[in-house]
Amino acid sequence: MKDGMRVGERFTHDFVVPPHKTVRHLYPESPEFAEFPEVFATGFMVGLMEWACVRAMAPYLEPGEGSLGTAICVTHTAATPPGLTVTVTAELRSVEGRRLSWRVSAHDGVDEIGSGTHERAVIHLEKFNAKVRQKTPAG
């Protein structure tokens, strides 16, 4: 990872919630999820928070590097219908070697809809993918 990321730096990422990012679409094979209202799913909100951190880190990664989420602790406090723009703010809290910790929050233009912390680890993609291949039946 290149130098330059500074604790306290903030990055924002906007996303217009489409109908296919609602609770019903998180696990479409689940009859239980089909009963939920058409609102932005917590699982998709978590993914959006990760995406903001990934984008913030991208300019600092060396060729062959990537990052993976290693921890997430967030609350989802308000419902967001499709069509609203969710803005995620990611603030870098710490850098410890290859581990980065973020404070994340999401706002839909009306309410803060979620907040918490997220951690990511910088990985060597080739090495990581080799380990994953060892876990597959074809190995």
Swiss-Prot record:
UniProt entry keywords in alphabetical sequence: Hydrolase
Gene3D superfamilies reported for this sequence: Hotdog Thioesterase
Reaction it catalyzes: fluoroacetyl-CoA + H2O = fluoroacetate + CoA + H(+)
E.C. designation(s): 3.1.2.29
Binding positions for substrate per the UniProt entry: 40-50, 69, 120
Known outcome of mutating residue 33 to A: Reduced activity
Active site, renumbered: 42, 50, 76
Acetylation found in the keyword field: no
Binding-site residues, CoA: 69, 76-77
GO terms of molecular function: acyl-CoA hydrolase activity; protein homodimerization activity
Effect of residue 23 to A: Reduced activity
Reported impact of residue 42 to C/S: Enhancement of acetyl-CoA binding, but reduced activity toward fluoroacetyl-CoA
PANTHER family tied to this protein: BLR0278 PROTEIN (PTHR36934), THIOESTERASE DOMAIN-CONTAINING PROTEIN (PTHR36934:SF1)
Function recorded in the entry: Hydrolyzes fluoroacetyl-CoA before it can react with citrate synthase, and thus confers fluoroacetate resistance. Cannot use acetyl-CoA as substrate.
Subunit organization: Homodimer.
Protein name as annotated: Fluoroacetyl-CoA thioesterase
